[in-house]
Amino acid sequence: MFISSAYAQNTETSLEHIKNVAERIDRVFPPFDFVHFGSHLFWLAISFGLFYLFISRVIVPRIGGVIETRRDRIASDLDQAMRMKQEADIVVETYERKLAQARSQAHVIAQTASEEIKQKVELERKEIEANLEKKLTDAEKQIAKIRDKAMKSVGSIAEEVALEIVKKLIDVEVSKESVRSAVKATGY
């Protein structure tokens, strides 16, 4: 086997180290040595005292400040949320009130328009009925005139026809006065 000089030197150091350890093997580890126990307690008390002082003077106030800031922020956020809720309630109430007003106005407008339309329709119906009544009355008058005129003509026509019939059937000439009186007796 090939042994380097560095490895050989390391072996010698290890032997010296073993000799030193053998000399100290009777000794106790200093932190566990009861001879030094009082000084350990002293430094422990000083360390914990300084640690307690540092925590109570620096860390706890900072944590308290953070907690207080957070509590203030939460309270502020709750106040702001309450204000915003009240504003939203006011806006909703205003909206509902305006919506109700708009609905009532729309109802009034629809009612008014309906009544106006009914009045216009009724007025037009009355005008048309009056116009038709007038035309009907005029037509009845004209019919009466035409009937009267026709009735007058019927009498003279009946007289002429009666004269012609008597002349042709009986071959006798009758006076117009006797035919007229006979036609008038029948109602023409």
From Swiss-Prot:
Its main location: membrane. Disulfide bonds: none annotated. It holds the Pfam family ATP-synt_B. GO terms for molecular function: proton-transporting ATP synthase activity, rotational mechanism; proton-transporting ATPase activity, rotational mechanism. Gene3D superfamilies: 6.10.250.1580. The chain crosses the membrane at residues 35-55. Keywords: ATP synthesis, Cell inner membrane, Cell membrane, CF(0), Hydrogen ion transport, Ion transport, Membrane, Transmembrane, Transmembrane helix, Transport. F-type ATPases have 2 components, F(1) - the catalytic core - and F(0) - the membrane proton channel. F(1) has five subunits: alpha(3), beta(3), gamma(1), delta(1), epsilon(1). F(0) has three main subunits: a(1), b(2) and c(10-14). The alpha and beta chains form an alternating ring which encloses part of the gamma chain. F(1) is attached to F(0) by a central stalk formed by the gamma and epsilon chains, while a peripheral stalk is formed by the delta and b chains. Belongs to the ATPase B chain family. This is ATP synthase subunit b 1.
